[in-house]
A protein has these predicted regions:
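Conserved small/polar residues in nucleotide/adenosyl-binding loops
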Residues: 1-5, 247-252
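Metallocofactor- and cofactor-centric catalytic cores in central/energy metabolism, strongly enriched
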Residues: 3-166, 172-196, 221
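Internal alpha/beta domain cores that form substrate/cofactor-binding pockets in large enzymes
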Residues: 189-195, 202, 220-239, 243-249
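Proline-aspartate-enriched helix->loop->beta-strand connector
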Residues: 207-208
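Structured, hydrophobic secondary-structure cores that serve as assembly/anchoring elements
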Residues: 215-218
Length: 253
């Protein structure tokens, strides 16, 4: 788990951006109050468009993070933890009696500064894809979100995804963590139908016993969440969803 991170900051890119409380009661609700943060203050040139500004800030953060990573490449780490996955066929042989479980991660892809990138490709332009869970630890998924920060996943959270870590802890003990499936949350119904159909098809092809689905964002992506859940369950696969509780304690929303 990374304890240091690069934070890009500056003039607002999109409304509803977030702040990090390093002390006080708010600090208990963010992991970033406990990390060592190198903050980059980025000032936009006059007249720059929002999407150009977001991309420039995002790539500036990448360059600094890569530079810091290179400085630490030859250092001896304080702790080493091994996460190991096997091939699908090998997993069947190694764990024949354990339930086959996959993690379906829905990625924000609504545009208008609600974007996520997979190996540099805008998630809006992708189809549901199988990944090895260790790929996300190496930065396969990065965030381009600048709106509703409390309900979006920054790159740090993708790299340290708690669902992936928890599934690895149970891998080979109570379950066989087969793979991770990523899918998008596009705004048009045709895209939602296509992606949810494809996600359910992949789950069926992998002969899964159980699936955990996590959602990013709220509102429009709620549709994607339920479509994914219903279609995966229609294939006879036990499905659990992870979503957010908004506004009211009785979950009326």
């Amino acid at each position: 788990v990374y304890k240091r991170q690069v934070v890009t900051a500056g003039r607002i890119v999109g409304f509803q951006e977030g702040i990090i409380d390093m002390t006080g009661p708010g600090a208990d609700y963010t992991p970033f109050s406990k990390t060592l943060n190198l903050v980059m203050v980025c000032e936009p040139v006059e007249g720059i468009k929002q999407h150009e500004y977001e991309k420039a800030v995002r790539f500036a953060g990448f360059r600094v993070a890569a530079y810091i990573g290179e400085l630490a490449r030859e250092l001896t780490p304080d702790e080493i933890k091994v996460y190991e996955t096997c091939g699908i066929k090998e997993g069947i042989t190694q764990y024949p009696d354990l339930p086959r479980v996959a993690y379906v991660q829905m990625l924000q892809s609504q545009g208008l500064l609600h974007d996520t990138y997979v190996y540099g490709v805008d998630a809006k332009k992708t189809l549901p894809t199988i990944l090895s869970p260790t790929e996300i630890m190496d930065g396969a998924i990065v965030s381009g979100n600048c709106v509703s920060a409390c309900d979006k996943n920054p790159t740090y959270v993708h790299e340290n995804n708690p669902v992936v870590h928890d599934l690895f802890e149970e891998h080979g003990k109570t379950l066989n963590f087969v793979c991770q499936i990523i899918t998008n949350e596009n705004v048009y119904l045709a895209d939602k139908e296509r992606s949810s159909d494809w996600t359910a098809k992949l789950c069926k092809m992998l002969d899964l016993d159980g699936v955990i689905v996590s959602q990013e964002g709220f509102g429009n992506p709620d549709t994607d969440l339920i479509m994914n859940c219903k279609k995966i369950e229609a294939e006879g696969i036990k499905t659990v969803i992870i979503t957010c509780l908004l506004y009211t304690s009785d979950a009326a929303d």
